Amino acid sequence: ANLLGHSLGGKAVMTFAISYPEKVEKLIVADIAPKAYPPHHQGIIKALQSVNFDEVKSRQDVENVLAQYIPEKFVIHFLTKNLYWTEDKKLNWRFNINTLAEKYNDFVANAIKFGKFEGETLFLAGAKSNYILPQDELLMRQQFPKYQLVSIADAGHWLQAENPKDFNQAVNEFLT
């Protein structure tokens, strides 16, 4: 399989690829390196937890709740792509927000400490982001020796939302 993960999802796919290399053909990691990071998305997690799905009736209602915590509309739109309608006709998150909140600090605060993935790997970095720094390439090379690094112009950490054209082009070129 080909795997793609952004940020925390990037850490997850790196860990999976190292743990189960026989299951991964190509790996794409968006705007995160295999290093430890200080936790700094607590505001977003708090916003996601603040949505009361017994009270909201529409995606717009959810966006209004998130807007109380998150000033960037494109981030809100990106996050609400993770909504779905349950069988009892209520909105909910596709992910377990309580587990994410509980484990988030442990996961981001730790580097990917073990192993190596020998398959082709694409790291995508937002040109305006500081998540992947030049000194991170040593770790990337050690654990993902067949890596390439592509910078996505005019994009910060939310590169797939800020510049989807260049993001998708880089992904498609890598996969073909």
Where in this protein do the model-derived segments appear?
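Short alpha-helical segment within the catalytic ATP-binding CA
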Residues: S7, K11-A12, W158
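Flexible "cap/lid" loop of the alpha/beta hydrolase fold
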Residues: M14-S19, K23-K57
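Conserved serine/cysteine hydrolase catalytic core
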Residues: E87-Q143, Q148-S151
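Catalytic active-site module of serine/aspartate enzymes centered on a nucleophile-bearing elbow/loop
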Residues: Y147-T176
